[in-house]
């Protein structure tokens, strides 16, 4: 039996790829594996903000969250996307349970204090109603796993006073994988893994160690937004997870293959 945390980007939730993920998930759950899903909703939140005439303010790649933005995130992430995702999973034979931070305090958080952020200048930045994960309701998740349910967590945390807080989905998934000491954290993205040439899907790198990652950054093969994503992924390995898989542009069976035969699909990150 393995413990798997699956992170789905908002762009995946309404794509045909989700059905491929769901079918592989059913096979994994039928094999008594414990699976938890974390999802974001950035693209959908930005689209709704535009429709409502609200400004989307990004600071060093992070969404500034005021009261109006938090209301959008509640509607989009904890509402529509969570319901739609659970519905698609249910249609494919998976038994999901939709959760967010206020659901049994599933995602416990505190408001992030102002801090200096790379790419945002020397002064501390206040991101507003943004949270840092401080824990999870692991007994609740354990009970769901025992009954072969799949927890589906929207990336909204909640503090002890009941205040909802926006949290980056990759961060929630990474922290959850560490807390569960997961066998694998799988990041399902819009790319088929880490590529030597971003324009050539066939240049996928099957396996990367920490030392190899540092070499690939130094020679420019890995750059831009992929650097912090992989940095955080390697921190997950230090925190107790056994492997991280970056996967996308899925074909039937890719998720199951990536877990059963690491490196056969996507890119697997390992500590050494």
UniProtKB/Swiss-Prot annotation:
Residues at which substrate binds: 41-42, 63, 166
Pfam families: AA_kinase
Site (Transition state stabilizer) location in chain: 7, 229
Keywords: Amino-acid biosynthesis, Arginine biosynthesis, ATP-binding, Cytoplasm, Kinase, Nucleotide-binding, Transferase
Cysteines engaged in disulfide bonds, as pairs: none
Principal location: cytoplasm
Reaction(s) this enzyme catalyzes, per UniProt: N-acetyl-L-glutamate + ATP = N-acetyl-L-glutamyl 5-phosphate + ADP
CDD domains in the record: AAK_NAGK-like (cd04238)
SUPFAM superfamilies found in the cross-reference section: Carbamate kinase-like
Annotated GO MF terms: acetylglutamate kinase activity; ATP binding
Compartments (UniProt record): Cytoplasm
Pathway(s) of this molecule: Amino-acid biosynthesis; L-arginine biosynthesis; N(2)-acetyl-L-ornithine from L-glutamate: step 2/4
Documented EC number(s): 2.7.2.8
Keyword check for Cytoplasm: yes
Any single Gene Ontology cellular-component annotation: cytoplasm
Gene3D superfamilies on file: Acetylglutamate kinase-like (3.40.1160.10)
HAMAP family, A to Z: ArgB
Family annotation (NCBIfam families): argB
Summary of the function given for this chain in its UniProt record: Catalyzes the ATP-dependent phosphorylation of N-acetyl-L-glutamate.
Protein's name according to its UniProt entry: Acetylglutamate kinase
């Amino acid at each position: 039996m393995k413990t798997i945390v699956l992170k789905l980007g908002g762009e995946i939730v309404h794509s045909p790829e989700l059905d491929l993920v769901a079918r592989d998930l059913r096979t994994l759950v039928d094999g008594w594996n414990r699976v938890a899903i974390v999802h974001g909703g950035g693209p959908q939140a930005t689209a709704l903000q535009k429709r409502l005439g609200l400004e989307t303010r990004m600071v060093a790649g992070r969404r500034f969250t005021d009261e109006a933005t938090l209301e959008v995130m509640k509607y989009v992430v904890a509402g529509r996307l969570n319901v739609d995702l659970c519905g698609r999973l249910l249609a494919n034979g998976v038994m999901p349970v939709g959760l967010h931070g206020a659901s049994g305090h599933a995602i416990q958080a505190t408001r992030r204090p102002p801090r200096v952020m790379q790419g945002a200048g020397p002064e501390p930045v206040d991101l507003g109603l943004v949270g840092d994960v401080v824990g999870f309701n692991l007994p609740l998740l354990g009970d769901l796993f025992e009954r072969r349910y799949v927890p589906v967590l929207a990336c909204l945390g909640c503090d002890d006073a009941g205040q909802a807080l926006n949290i980056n989905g990759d961060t929630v998934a990474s922290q959850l994988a560490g807390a569960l000491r997961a066998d694998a954290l799988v990041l399902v993205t819009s790319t088929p893994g880490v590529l030597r040439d971003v324009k050539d899907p066939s240049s996928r790198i099957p396996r990367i160690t920490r030392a190899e990652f540092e070499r690939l950054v130094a020679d420019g093969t890995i750059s831009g937004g992929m650097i912090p994503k992989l940095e955080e992924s390697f921190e997950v390995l230090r925190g107790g997870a056994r492997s991280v898989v970056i996967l996308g542009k899925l074909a039937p069976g890719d998720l199951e293959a990536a877990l059963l035969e690491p490196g056969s699909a996507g890119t697997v990150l390992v500590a050494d």
